[in-house]
Amino acid sequence: MSHQPTTENDNRYWIGFDLGGTKMLATVFNSQFKKVGRARKKTKGRDGMKAGLLRINTVIQEALNDADVSADQVGGLGIGCPGPLDLAKRQIRTAPNLGWDDVPVADSIEKEFKFPVAIANDVDAGVFGEYKFGAGQNARCVFGIFPGTGIGGGCVYEGRLFRGA
């Protein structure tokens, strides 16, 4: 069954991607940010960066298939990435838990799917998500600590994300 957009004028879908030390998860949302598809796999970072980039693209395609959505219907993808990032180059500088360095993650996804990609630190993305859509809605300040394969913290104050090192 195909998911229809929820407004007449906006037929775009959006993808959120969480790249973690042990798992990767893609979720497809309709224009009202209702979940309509998802896919998840183990990250297997030690298989190497090139294998990891291919695995990311596979998970995205599986999520699109689950949602019965084609890439040309997607308005964009946001990916939360571990480790220090180069936001200007849209790359992971280093992801120690994965063993990857200088990863052109946004370019790889855009080359494959032809929709825009934004990257963010995974914890920053999680905290901002809670501020915008979760427990922190209507709060002036949201601070989060995210333990996982590693640990990180983030803060949103009056709608502004404060980025760390």
Language model features with spans:
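Nucleotide/phosphate-binding catalytic cleft detector across ATP-hydrolyzing
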Residues: M1-W14, F115-V117, A135-V142
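Glycine-rich phosphate-binding loop and adjoining helix at the ATP-binding site
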Residues: M49-N57, Q73-L77, G83-C141
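Glycine-rich phosphate-binding loop of actin/hexokinase-like ATP-binding domains
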Residues: Q137-A165
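Short glycine-rich anion-binding loops that position phosphate/pyrophosphate groups of nucleotides
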Residues: T22, P82-L85, G148-G150
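Short glycine-aspartate micro-motif
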Residues: W14-D18, V74-G78, V142-F146, G152
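Conserved active-site "lid/cap" helical segment
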Residues: R55-A71
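Short glycine-rich, Thr/Ser-proximal phosphate-binding strand/loop in the N-terminal lobe
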Residues: E8-T58, Q91-T94, L161, A165
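Short, acidic, Ser/Thr-enriched surface-loop or helix-capping motifs
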Residues: N30, L87, V156-Y157
